[in-house]
Amino acid sequence: MSTKTNIQKDWEQREFIEDMSINIQKIVEFLNKFELSTRNKLSDLNEKLTILDRQVDYLEATFKTVQE
């Protein structure tokens, strides 16, 4: 009986390890997709902020020349 119990415990441990490995892989895939998505969104936001910054600089320069 002890051998059978040991074999059963071994299988349970192997199944647990396999389940953990699969779940870790899923988490890694999610994080990689999230990182890519976030990087793209931040890049788009950076471009928009750069455009807005240039527009503000232009408006400030225009306003200064009008005041003079």
UniProtKB/Swiss-Prot annotation:
<comment type="similarity">
    <text>Belongs to the BRK1 family.</text>
</comment>
<keyword id="KW-0206">Cytoskeleton</keyword>
<dbReference type="InterPro" id="IPR033378">
    <property type="entry name" value="BRICK1"/>
</dbReference>
<dbReference type="GO" id="GO:0008064">
    <property type="term" value="P:regulation of actin polymerization or depolymerization"/>
</dbReference>
<dbReference type="GO" id="GO:0031269">
    <property type="term" value="P:pseudopodium assembly"/>
</dbReference>
<dbReference type="GO" id="GO:0046847">
    <property type="term" value="P:filopodium assembly"/>
</dbReference>
<dbReference type="GO" id="GO:0005856">
    <property type="term" value="C:cytoskeleton"/>
</dbReference>
<protein>
    <recommendedName>
        <fullName>Protein BRICK1</fullName>
    </recommendedName>
</protein>
<dbReference type="GO" id="GO:0031143">
    <property type="term" value="C:pseudopodium"/>
</dbReference>
<dbReference type="GO" id="GO:0032433">
    <property type="term" value="C:filopodium tip"/>
</dbReference>
<comment type="subunit">
    <text>Part of a Scar/WAVE complex containing brk1, scrA, abiA, pirA and napA. Interacts with scrA.</text>
</comment>
<comment type="function">
    <text>Involved in regulation of actin and microtubule organization.</text>
</comment>
<dbReference type="GO" id="GO:0044877">
    <property type="term" value="F:protein-containing complex binding"/>
</dbReference>
<dbReference type="GO" id="GO:0048870">
    <property type="term" value="P:cell motility"/>
</dbReference>
<dbReference type="GO" id="GO:0007015">
    <property type="term" value="P:actin filament organization"/>
</dbReference>
<dbReference type="GO" id="GO:0000281">
    <property type="term" value="P:mitotic cytokinesis"/>
</dbReference>
<dbReference type="GO" id="GO:0031252">
    <property type="term" value="C:cell leading edge"/>
</dbReference>
<feature type="coiled-coil region">
    <location>
        <begin position="37"/>
        <end position="62"/>
    </location>
</feature>
<keyword id="KW-0175">Coiled coil</keyword>
<keyword id="KW-0963">Cytoplasm</keyword>
<dbReference type="GO" id="GO:0042802">
    <property type="term" value="F:identical protein binding"/>
</dbReference>
<dbReference type="GO" id="GO:0060187">
    <property type="term" value="C:cell pole"/>
</dbReference>
<dbReference type="GO" id="GO:0031209">
    <property type="term" value="C:SCAR complex"/>
</dbReference>
<dbReference type="GO" id="GO:0060090">
    <property type="term" value="F:molecular adaptor activity"/>
</dbReference>
<dbReference type="GO" id="GO:0005911">
    <property type="term" value="C:cell-cell junction"/>
</dbReference>
